[in-house]
């Protein structure tokens, strides 16, 4: 087996002033990824990553905590303004957006990029509870 040299790869601190926040809110979880203009990920977080398990991941509070965590990580890289692209039908859409504002970002645009089929695949059957 190869011997470990002991070098640790350090993540260099980029100074990026503006970026894009991708909020993916599904019925089960909310994921927030903050990228630069080219699409390279700067920081990310999700409700599950913040320690919420099961049905608590789909709550607006869990989405708020995930957005705050991703926003604080991105602010360490010098980010100040963001565009927000929201996709999915989940309950964490608005709360994640408010959390990004409360961290201190200046939001320039808000865009809904939820994919809508033009009568594509058949949807799953209705739940009977």
Curated annotation (Swiss-Prot):
For this UniProt entry, which segments traverse the membrane?
A: none
Report if keyword RNA-binding is assigned: yes
GO biological processes: translation
> Which keywords does this chain's UniProt record carry?
Ribonucleoprotein, Ribosomal protein, RNA-binding, rRNA-binding
Question: Which superkingdom heads the taxonomic lineage of this protein's source?
Answer: Bacteria
**What InterPro entries is this protein classified in?**
Ribosomal_uS11, Ribosomal_uS11_bac-type, Ribosomal_uS11_CS, Ribosomal_uS11_sf
Q: A cellular component term (GO) from this record?
A: ribosome
A single Gene Ontology MF term assigned here is: structural constituent of ribosome
How does the record describe its quaternary structure?
Part of the 30S ribosomal subunit. Interacts with proteins S7 and S18. Binds to IF-3.
| Task of the protein | Located on the platform of the 30S subunit, it bridges several disparate RNA helices of the 16S rRNA. Forms part of the Shine-Dalgarno cleft in the 70S ribosome.
Q: What is this protein called?
A: Small ribosomal subunit protein uS11
Species for this entry: Maricaulis maris (strain MCS10)
């Amino acid at each position: 087996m190869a011997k470990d040299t002991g070098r640790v790869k350090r993540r260099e601190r980029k100074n990026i002033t503006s970026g894009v926040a991708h909020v993916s809110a599904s019925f089960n979880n909310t994921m927030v990824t903050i990228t630069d203009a080219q699409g390279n990920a700067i920081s990310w977080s999700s409700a599950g990553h913040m320690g919420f398990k099961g049905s608590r991941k789909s709550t607006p509070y869990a989405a708020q905590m995930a957005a705050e965590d991703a926003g604080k990580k991105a602010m360490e890289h010098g980010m100040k303004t963001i565009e927000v692209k929201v996709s999915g039908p989940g309950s964490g859409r608005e709360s994640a957006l408010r959390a990004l504002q409360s961290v201190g970002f200046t939001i320039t645009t808000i865009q809904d990029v939820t994919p809508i089929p033009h009568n594509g695949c058949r949807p799953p059957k209705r739940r009977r509870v």
